């Protein structure tokens, strides 16, 4: 090694890294997508989506019920927060049901299937008893409990069909009987048609459509062939066409599809058209919470069936897209739980609950947008109505319990250690010492020290 002019050894410079340009450089968007996929594939993703999505939908629904129901309550000479307080009470009770259902073992879920089905059938039959059943908006599907409280037994019929149908199909799959048509159809389809008949006696076709969707979802999960689907669908379509043709009210709802004027000939399309008006006047970010104009007596059922229209008017396109995204996340999580489990009951029950909530949301939102006839079904977890909220929150608790039963999710939860209290494997745990990052005070030194 030769020395420099000053006699010092030359300093070796570090080799410069070649500048990477073009496609060799990592794309930040690609990194973000990879990280998002990793987060999406985590074992507890479905658990958090169900828990967080349902909580956000319920809370936002409470806010919109309070906003959309004030004028209706005042018109009925009631306090402005009347409907909100009833919905808040139902949400509190539903939260308890959700917590209980999420902590139940799967065996207990299966044990509850037959009692819930029997109770739903008895209550739905009592609706038709004079003096017991109550008619609301032309549909006799209610039972007066006491005071101003009423229950709609047909809402519990959805939960009954999901649990009982899932238990029935799981038992037959364990015995390898689902390859035969008669075991796939009987007694599932006759029991479902019995529930549909009890519902249609009260004139509630919207709930009947949801129940039919749940039935088709269970048959699809059971592996029903296409010919079987076509046969059952043909029977359901024929019965539906007869019921629509024989009802002037249902024919009028069909005539309101695509209507742009409140009065289309002899048909009154006031509700459908004013729902479109509410959505159109909201713009991107809405007129502001509580500033809806259509809820001032212009839009019927503003806090129940058409609460999505009030949401679009007050929160705009951003608010409605947020609601759609939450329901999409909830539906994806339910499909993921049903697809990853090895327990046939969990697969059928999770698929049935997901079909129930997703189909009801699509029918409600489609009716508000003018894409589907008005079916008179509430938006799940969002619209006013305790009878619809309680079984729906119990069903969400089922999904949470099923998401926790996933082997990977169970392992991820077991690896977590509690930060406070006792350890999982017994014994006591010392209190955690927090790192405060404080600097020590300088120690005073004598004048003789350096």
PLM regions: where:
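A juxtamembrane structural motif centered on a specific transmembrane helix
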Residues: 1-29, 365-450
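Active-site-proximal helix-loop elements at catalytic-domain edges
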Residues: 2-34, 275, 325, 332-357
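Cytosolic juxtamembrane amphipathic/interface segments immediately preceding
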Residues: 29-45
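Hydrophobic alpha-helical transmembrane segments of multi-pass inner membrane proteins, especially
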Residues: 51-67, 73-271, 309-367, 394, ...
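Glycine/serine-rich anion-binding loops at beta->alpha junctions
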Residues: 147-157, 201-203, 283, 287-288, ...
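Transmembrane helix boundary and interhelical junction motifs in multipass membrane proteins
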Residues: 204-209, 287-292, 302-304, 321, ...
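TM-adjacent membrane-interface loops and short helices in multi-pass inner/ER membrane proteins
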Residues: 260-304, 315-319
